[in-house]
Each structure stands twice: as structure tokens, then as C-alpha cells.
Amino acid sequence: MKVAVTGAGGYIGRFVVKTLVDQGHEVVAIDFVHQGIDERAKICDVNIFSGEPDVYEKMGCPDSVIHLAWKDGFVHNSNAHMDNLSSHYKFLRNLVDAGCKNISVMGTMHEIGFYEGKIDENTPCNPLSQYGIAKNALRQAL
């Protein structure tokens, strides 16, 4: 299976890429920084936030897309989270409109906010940071 991974050089992305390649998948790695990306993956220099409707084709029409890219993920109150929200949404809409059938978008514990105890898909979201608010808004918009 051909799998595109955005944020492929990031904190989680580099391990996702390695695991997928180890499992025999063809991996298209997308990131602004290529350092740390498994050499067996194909690097794709496409700007996923350009708003171009043909972004799926530029990625090589993968069978699946795992969207991990997120600027300033460790800076929880960065203005970038809200500033870039529409770009994330447009990127994902363009994938769907182009026919991509399998898309996974990484969420975060910051969507839940402060919560003690076990969480599951029914745990209410109460994000407290710009990061959590933006991630939650993207999930709700989709």
C-alpha cells in the first residue's frame, strides 16, 4: 500500500514512517525538514498548505494519508494554531475532493483539556490551549 505521511520528520512522524516501511509499505514522506526521515521513504516536496486542489496528485495519489503535520505543536499557545487552521482544513478537503478514501488525522490529548481518569471516544472535549482548540476545531469541522 502507498501511504503518504505529513510531518514525516516530526516527533511522531519519523517513527510512523519507519514502521510503515518496515512493514513493506511504499511511503511518501512530506515535511519541510527532511532530517531524520527514513532513507527508504520517498521524499515529496509538496507544500500541503498551498491550497492547490491538485495536492493529492502531487503526492502521487497514495492509497492512504496520515496527517501528522502541525506547526508549533510544542508551543501550546502559539498564534500559528489558529492562523493555520483553515489551511489544514483546505488540505484535507482537497484530498477528499480528489478521491482519497483513507485519511487519518492525528488528534491530541490537548483536545480533552484537564481531565483525570480514563478517557475514550465519549470523553467530552474542553481544550484549554490554542493548540487544543485548533485541533478540536479541525476534528469538528471534518
Q: Where do the language-model regions lie?
A:
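SDR active-site strand-loop-helix element
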Residues: 6, 30, 65-68, 103-109
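Conserved glycine-rich Rossmann-like NAD(P)H-binding loop of the short-chain dehydrogenase/reductase
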Residues: 25-36
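Active-site Tyr-X1-5-Lys
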Residues: 128-142
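NAD(P)H-binding glycine-rich loop region in Rossmannoid oxidoreductase-like domains
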Residues: 48-85
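Conserved Rossmann-fold NAD(P)-dependent oxidoreductase catalytic core, especially the SDR/UDP-sugar
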Residues: 90-130
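Rossmann-fold cofactor-recognition segment
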Residues: 38-51
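Rossmann-fold NAD(P)-dependent oxidoreductase module
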Residues: 15-19, 94, 141
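N-terminal Rossmann NAD(P)H-binding glycine-rich loop of SDR-like oxidoreductase domains
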Residues: 3-23
